Amino acid sequence: NYCYFIMEFVQKGNIYSLISQDKTKRLSNHLIANLMKDVISAVYFLHKMNPPIIHRDIKPENVLLAEGNVAKLTDFGWSNYMQDDEKRTTVCGTPIYLAPEIIDETGHDEKVDVWCIGILLFELSTGNIPFLGNNIETLKSNIRNMNISWPRDINPEIKNLISKILKYDPKARISIPEILNHSFFTTYIDNPTQYLITPDEQTQYKPFVVSTDNPKDPPVIINKMVKE
């Protein structure tokens, strides 16, 4: 009569809580690099699925923190599949993270997630968002015109990387492997692109049934990790 879902417990809250704890205290570059590596590898995995999945709402509130500061991407409420070269047209996501092509309703693809990666990196590095506005129209205008509010003390390597990601033209944005190959990541992570795993390469999960000796206990289906 019942269906039980056994879900992972991620006990350290989300990245937003980490940033907002003390805005005067910056996160270390090492921590930023490793948190972003986890998010980027998750996005890469989604984009390599068949068909590809775009998340469309990557932001600090949607990145959970597990023990050891392992970042886990969550909340797929705005996600969707990509079919062939067809672009999506739904205006969705959180305004301060919207890519220009979503604002302009010209159609969008996986590159909207790359844009959000740049926004997230900016926020982790500075504690602020790159595009400001007292109202939604001013915000949209600043995004369209690429009016980025750069802090004077931002790490030069991070600024260089963000500048390569936050491009108005989606085709001009660097790819996910290029992001992880940037000097900012290679400085703090050994061979960061090794974490880019495709669905075909990942260890597979197979369901199996667990039961007890008590006939009154319902069987439980668990997704067990097995190597093909």
What are these regions (language model features)?
Residues 50-65:
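Catalytic-loop of the protein kinase fold
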